[in-house]
């Protein structure tokens, strides 16, 4: 769906020295992106953030009008209460994160945010985890897919993006509806992911920016 008048803020990060080979390392996930090793060389200078602003008449990246997914205040409160109850039931964010995704040694979870991931089938509500190694999304509800045996099964939609694979983060908003804000994550291999409908948009962006900066500094020291 085309959207008129979008303002973007771009933050670009140098490619890291070492890069994992896949975006979805969790074997339980039905969608897997296999990515070849990046041919880009790591920059030797200190991390630099390049901020740009641009306005476009529209784009067709599968981003939907947030007015269709924007929850009412009562629905937002219910989502927060429901999430809080689930976190308490499982035993904390760390346990939820480790249940959903593979966690490497020394990996630290920073924050978790509720948002939507844009797909060709429409926005999917879920949880976005930001750690010292990756950003990872898991849908709140399971979806129906065909198994290799031809059966219909229900699985959670998962996307895991190593921080060292992220080339830039585009911070966008609809200039006609400033409350509609988006995060586009572009990888060094040309994949792009659109996140929207955040309950805490700016906090999520700041957390991701900090995680990327720390990740670059760690890779540079290795």
From Swiss-Prot:
Matches recorded under Pfam families: GRAM
TM region positions: none
Ranges of residues in domain GRAM: 95-173
InterPro entries assigned: GEM-like, GRAM, PH-like_dom_sf
The family this protein is said to belong to: Belongs to the GEM family.
The protein, known as: GEM-like protein 4
Organism listed in the record: Arabidopsis thaliana (Mouse-ear cress)
């Amino acid at each position: 769906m085309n959207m008129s008048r979008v303002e973007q803020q771009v933050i670009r990060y140098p490619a890291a020295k070492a890069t994992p080979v896949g975006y979805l390392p969790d074997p339980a996930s039905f969608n897997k992106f296999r990515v070849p090793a990046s041919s880009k060389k790591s920059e030797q200078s200190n991390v630099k953030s390049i901020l740009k602003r641009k306005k476009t008449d529209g784009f067709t990246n599968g981003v939907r009008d947030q007015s269709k997914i924007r929850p009412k205040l009562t629905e937002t409160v219910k989502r927060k209460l429901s999430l809080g109850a689930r976190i308490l039931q499982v035993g904390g964010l760390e346990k939820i994160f480790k249940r959903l995704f593979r966690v490497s040694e020394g990996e630290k979870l920073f924050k978790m945010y509720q948002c939507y991931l844009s797909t060709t089938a429409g926005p999917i509500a879920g949880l976005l985890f930001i750690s010292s190694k990756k950003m990872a999304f898991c849908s709140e509800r399971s979806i129906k897919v065909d198994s290799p045996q031809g059966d219909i099964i229900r699985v959670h939609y998962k996307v895991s993006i190593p921080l060292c694979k992220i080339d830039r983060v585009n911070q966008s908003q609809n200039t006609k509806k400033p409350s509609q804000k988006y995060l586009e994550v572009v990888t060094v291999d040309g994949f792009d992911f659109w996140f929207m409908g955040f309950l805490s948009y700016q906090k999520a962006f700041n957390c991701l920016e900090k995680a990327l900066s720390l990740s670059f500094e760690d890779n540079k020291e290795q």
